[in-house]
Amino acid sequence: MKEDPPSILQTQRFWDAFYINDRVAEFRRWLYIEAYGDEYPAELGTDGYITRSELRQMADALHVGPGQKIADMGCGRGGPGQWIARATGAALVGIDISDVALQKARERARQPGITVSYQTGSFDSTGLDAATFDGAMSVDVIWAIPDKRAGFAETVRILKPGARFVFTDWERDLSPPNYPPPFRDHLAVLKAVGFEIELHQVLTDAEAVRRVFYEKMLARQDELIRDLGEQAAQLRLREGRAWMGLIDGVDYLKHSRRVLVAARKVGHLLP
């Protein structure tokens, strides 16, 4: 029987719990550094798989600059969006369902050289005005959205004609049990809601590096339990075992592709 998607309140509680534990974030950050080396932007406090090279590529693909405004959809702690704002000179509005994440993003934003603001909202209901943004971005969020078409439709709604939506995410043929169902094709849904595709790039080394991340995490499970406590540690360890096929024998990383996508809202081209 098909399960109903989680309610807004359930989703908020899940992500608040995810973001509130700074010890988990710090432990994962060290694992990212070990897996990615200098490519990992540790200074941004990000809790995802974004790299410096991908951030530069996203900034270029947005085609925005000073005097323009971009939305960071599912901004989390805000680090990648703030990097993009600084690199492009554009103002940024971050949207996230977690008030805990937004508070951490606001604290991180207390620095000169960027214009940023944050407000509570979901990917498919941002509360932003229509056709007012010169670009939108998202880092490793879309996989968790139950209704991806609604999320893409909301993104196209807030963008001006010709504006770009640039994001990283995963396309998957299989997902472990108790994870969101696999999503294989962003492009068809993007086109259906009014985007034209400018870039669809499979990040070829991404899942190999994610495997290294999980291997290092499992190798340090005693340290993880000591630092995070049994319950929090076992959640992270189960994630690694599940994706590597150590629970049911299916290596799900072999059925997963991390992608970088740039799509333009149909209309006049931006400079």
Please place each PLM-identified region on the residue numbering.
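A short acidic, Gly/Pro-enriched loop at the edge of an enzyme's catalytic core
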Residues: 124-136
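A short SAM/SAH-binding and catalytic strip from SAM-dependent methyltransferases
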Residues: 135-147
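A short glycine-rich, Lys/Arg-flanked "PGG" loop and its adjoining helix->strand segment in the class I
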Residues: 149-164
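Conserved class I S-adenosyl-L-methionine
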Residues: 164-187
